[in-house]
Structures are given as structure tokens and as C-alpha cells.
Amino acid sequence: MEIKKVVVIGSGTMGSGIAAHLCNANIPVTLLDLKTEISKQARDKIHKSRPPLLLDKSKINNIKVGNILDNFDEVKEADWVVEAVVERIDIKHDIYKKIFKERKKGAIVSSNTSSIPIKILSQHLSEEEKKDFCITHFFNPVRYMGLLEIVKNENNDLDKINSL
């Protein structure tokens, strides 16, 4: 599977770091948060960061910003949706419910969690949804760590997950 477009939900340290990393790989990213202003501030921090998060400052144009109320339809066009929100299972479950309702068929959905087991994250997902769900734990700072931990579940489509 080729990843051509990504949506990152949550524009904190990890979400913005993931967005910048994908941007460096020339993958267009939409960065969503509760308010568009929060996503804009995150994009500004990416642009001004020291040490730089971007290989080339012009790549910032590959990051589109928005909010989860007005711009959630961006999920429909994404090949991969990364959840990078606060470590609260109730919030994560609510977001997954919305993502799986809106995503295009076959799009990968992942969590950047480092502390919640995949069985808990995926407990409300259907067997079909679990095929496309995994944990993609990026390490901070994303650009410099060069490490991605992928935690799969027993239902994963391995060819798809291996494309990450």
C-alpha cells in the first residue's frame, strides 16, 4: 500500500513531530486539533523549531491545518490516520468511532500511544476495523530518533501494516 496522504489528529509535541516527519518524506499531511488555532500554532512551531524539524522550510506547505469539527472530512481522503491525542482511553475510543465512520475503505488507522495496550485501544472495533488498526509509536524527537515501534493485533492485514 502506498501512503499518499495522512491525517494526524492531535497537534501536540508528538502529533506535530509526526506531521513534520511525514512532510520530510514528501507526504501531504492534515494536522487536526480541537481548534484550528492550535493546529496553526503547532505548524508555526514546526517551522521555527531549533533544532529544525523540517529538512527544508518550504516543506511546511505540505502541512494543512484544521479542527476536528469543521475539517474531519479530511479523513475521507487519507491513506493513513494517526491518532496522537492525550492518553485518555475514552477520548481515543470516541475518536476511533468517528475515524472508522468517515475513513476511506482500507485506510490504516493507528495510535501513537506508548502506554495503552492494543487490546484496550481496539476493544470496541469490529473484526474488519481491526485489520487496519495498529499502534505506531514514534519516539521524540521524531526526526532525530529514527525509531518507530509498530504494535499489531491478531487481525491485522500484515501486507498493509508492513507498508508503514
Language-model features, listed with the residues they occupy:
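Rossmann-like NAD(P)-binding element
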Residues: 34-41, 52-109, 115-120, 147-148
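Rossmann-fold dinucleotide-binding core
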Residues: 107-164
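Short, flexible turn/loop "capping" segments at secondary-structure junctions
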Residues: 23-24, 75, 141-145
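NAD(P)+-binding Rossmann beta1-loop-alpha1 motif at the extreme N-terminus of oxidoreductases
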Residues: 1-48, 102
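Structural motif
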Residues: 9, 17, 66, 84, ...
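Short, glycine/charged-enriched secondary-structure capping and boundary segments
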Residues: 21-24, 44-46, 94-98, 122-127, ...
